[in-house]
């Protein structure tokens, strides 16, 4: 009987200790802070040769996750400036709500626009530079921007087989001010028509489309963008091609971009990349565009550090002299 009482006492103590440990276990913090840094060495063979060390981007992300499906994000974007050392600006600042069991997430504030983040996720080499629609200026600093101020909804269905986004925004991007009473409407939809071993929101054989319809601040001229993309992504490689039609008032331009990424094995720390962008700011004017060719190889030094060596060649039409860049770039995530 004494042994039985001792056993019961030990068992009761063990259960109590386990329950107490569970109560005292550290909870995931509701707010986390992280960052992404892109830095590089660049040599350019322009008329005046240049070679520079740069920090091309430094993002600080503050993410909040709270009860009832509420999340928040604040992202600062630190960029180089010719006049001063660095410039700090706001890139994302929004609250989001995902109702319990819903496939939709509602956002308010300075939010992602539908396309740029989607394509950057597919390409996965933002460290090299901006994608074609964010790099080539037709009707502004860039044809599309990554963020804008407004409201939107993201959705995904059937394990990301279909995903999309719809927003109503000012239309001036995250660095262009608030604009006027006119607003832009933008939407994206992506459909996985064939699965692969990559079941992410960009994985598989996909057909994706985007439309952005708006008016230029002040003049009210058309500011429309239409894009179609066909992409194929597995764990080992990515292939994609897109066509973009851009209308600003009476001027229509176009962008064609194709890119690929190949990992030498699956998984592998080494990958090779290639991209071609063909830019025509006005389809009614001859020899006013340019072609950019990018090729390089990357090495994943650790989960937090990626290195990239690449060549970037920009050739204008009409006999313009090509500009070649050799770059050694690094991405740090923390």
Annotate the PLM regions.
Residues 182, 190-283:
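Detector for outer-membrane/organellar transmembrane beta-barrel domains
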Residues 187-189, 322-334:
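Outer-membrane beta-barrel "beta-signal"
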Residues 261-308, 312:
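Outer membrane beta-barrel transmembrane domains
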Residues 44-48, 81-84, 174-177, 216-219, ...:
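A generic structural signal for short coil/turn motifs at secondary-structure boundaries
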Residues 50-54, 85-87, 141-145, 179-181, ...:
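Short sequence motifs at beta-strands and strand-loop junctions characteristic
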């Amino acid at each position: 009987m004494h042994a039985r009482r001792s056993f019961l006492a030990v068992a009761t103590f063990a259960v109590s200790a386990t329950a107490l440990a569970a109560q005292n276990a550290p909870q995931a913090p509701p707010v986390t802070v992280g960052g992404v840094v892109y830095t590089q060495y660049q040599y350019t063979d322009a008329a005046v040769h240049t070679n520079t060390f740069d920090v091309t981007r430094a993002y600080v992300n503050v993410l909040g996750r709270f009860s009832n499906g509420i999340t928040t994000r604040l992202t600062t974007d630190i960029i180089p400036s010719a006049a001063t050392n660095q410039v700090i600006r706001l890139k994302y600042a929004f609250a989001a709500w995902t109702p319990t069991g819903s496939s939709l997430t509602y956002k308010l504030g300075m939010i992602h626009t539908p396309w740029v983040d989607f394509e950057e996720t597919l390409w996965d080499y933002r460290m090299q530079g901006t994608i074609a629609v964010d790099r080539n200026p037709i009707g502004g600093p860039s044809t599309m921007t990554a963020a804008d101020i407004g409201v939107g909804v993201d959705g995904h269905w059937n394990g990301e087989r279909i995903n999309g986004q719809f927003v109503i925004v000012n239309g001036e991007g995250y660095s262009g001010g608030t604009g006027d009473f006119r607003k832009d409407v933008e939407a994206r939809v992506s459909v996985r028509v064939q699965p692969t071993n990559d079941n992410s929101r960009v994985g598989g054989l996909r057909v994706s489309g985007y439309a952005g319809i708006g008016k230029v601040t002040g003049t009210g001229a058309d500011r429309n963008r239409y894009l179609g993309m066909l992409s194929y992504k597995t764990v080992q490689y990515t292939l994609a091609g897109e066509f973009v039609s851009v209308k600003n008032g009476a001027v229509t331009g176009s962008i064609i971009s194709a890119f690929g990424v190949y990992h030498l094995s699956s998984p592998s720390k080494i990958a090779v990349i290639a991209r071609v962008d063909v830019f025509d700011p006005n389809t009614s004017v001859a020899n006013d565009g340019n072609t950019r060719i990018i090729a390089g190889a990357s090495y994943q030094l650790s989960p937090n550090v990626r290195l990239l060596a690449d060549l970037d060649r920009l050739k204008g039409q009409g006999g313009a002299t090509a500009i070649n860049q050799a770059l050694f770039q690094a991405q740090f995530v923390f």
